[in-house]
UniProtKB/Swiss-Prot annotation:
Ranges annotated as biased composition (Polar residues): 259-271
Note from the entry: Present with 1730 molecules/cell in log phase SD medium.
Main location per the UniProt record: cytoplasm
A GO-annotated cellular component: cytoplasm
Cell membrane as UniProt keyword: no
Compositional bias annotation for Basic residues: 86-99, 231-241
Organism: Saccharomyces cerevisiae (strain ATCC 204508 / S288c) (Baker's yeast)
Keywords per UniProt: Cytoplasm
UniProt protein name: Uncharacterized protein YKL023W
Region (Disordered): 33-168, 210-277
Keyword Cytoplasm recorded: yes
Gene Ontology BP annotations: nuclear-transcribed mRNA catabolic process
Length: 277
């Protein structure tokens, strides 16, 4: 299995491609195992070759474990994404000048896998031509460690940048929240002052209302007293008028009596005194 096929099934995360990923991984492991067995059988001729084969076996197993871990990590990271959409999205993101954290992680893992595949291809071609030798394996292991370290530093720098961006956003949000809190506290003080003013106004209105009620009661009392006084005076005037009317009636009666007595002829008795009827 070549490098392009390995990268192809890493980027394609559909159900069929995941099955193909498992089968290709098993085939790759079998190929490594068979190649390792053949190389071990060939190198058993000398003690130096045997030591180199054992070192190569350990290194191959460690590298295989690293690749399996990377494959499992990539399957969890890029699961549920269409590879064609992922490629098109990554192109669009690079044109715009930025990409999502998920795509950055995928690109980082892809870079690591490419380095691993290149190392294995270089190792296999070199050993097929020149045979096993300890010193190139040692150099390759150092290069692998250096590349892993560089990839980790790259991912660390990306995480550091993301952390700085998140910290900056959090600080801005914290400032906004502090401003809102200060505004709410100021508004609360204003409302408390307004409440005190309303309490004072309410107390003033209550006092005014009590005074008005008191004045109203006094007015009603005074009015009733005035009405009583008016009634008394009215009764007195009525009685006085009636007395005057009676006096006038008596006078009229006397006058009438005098007129009637004058209208009749007077008669005298034997003594010459008028006779009254």
């Amino acid at each position: 299995m070549n490098k392009e096929e390995l990268l192809g099934f890493l980027l394609d995360d559909s159900i069929d491609s995941q099955k193909r990923c498992v089968t290709d991984q098993q085939a790759y492991s079998n190929w490594l195992k068979n190649d390792n067995d053949e190389r071990t059988a060939h190198e058993e001729s000398s003690s130096q070759s045997t030591i180199a084969a054992l070192n190569k076996k350990k290194q191959t197993e460690a590298a295989q474990e690293d690749i399996e871990e990377l494959l499992n990590g990539l399957e969890g990271i890029i699961g549920g994404a269409d590879p064609r959409n992922l490629k098109s999205k990554s192109k669009r993101k690079t044109k715009k000048g930025g990409s999502k954290p998920r795509e950055e992680n995928v690109n980082t893992e892809k870079h690591i896998v490419m380095l691993e595949v290149e190392d294995f291809s270089d190792m296999s071609t070199h050993e097929d031509v020149n045979g096993a030798s300890p010193s190139p394996n040692l150099d390759r292991s150092k290069k692998n460690e250096k590349r892993r370290k560089n990839a980790k530093e790259l991912s660390y720098d990306e995480l550091k940048d993301k952390l700085e961006v998140t910290t900056r956003k959090s600080r801005l949000e914290c400032k906004d929240l502090k401003k809102k809190v200060h505004g709410l506290e100021r508004r609360n003080l204003e409302l408390e002052q307004r409440l005190e003013e309303l309490k004072i106004e309410n107390q003033t209105l209550i006092e005014i209302n009590n005074k008005l009620l008191k004045n109203t009661n006094e007015d009603e009392i005074n009015k009733s007293q005035r009405n009583k006084e008016k009634d008394r005076k009215r009764r007195e005037r009525r009685t006085a008028r009636r007395k005057d009317e009676r006096k006038q009636e008596k006078k009229q009666e006397k006058k009438q009596d005098n007129k009637t007595s004058q209208s009749f002829p007077s008669s005298t008795d034997m003594n010459g005194q008028p006779i009254e009827f």
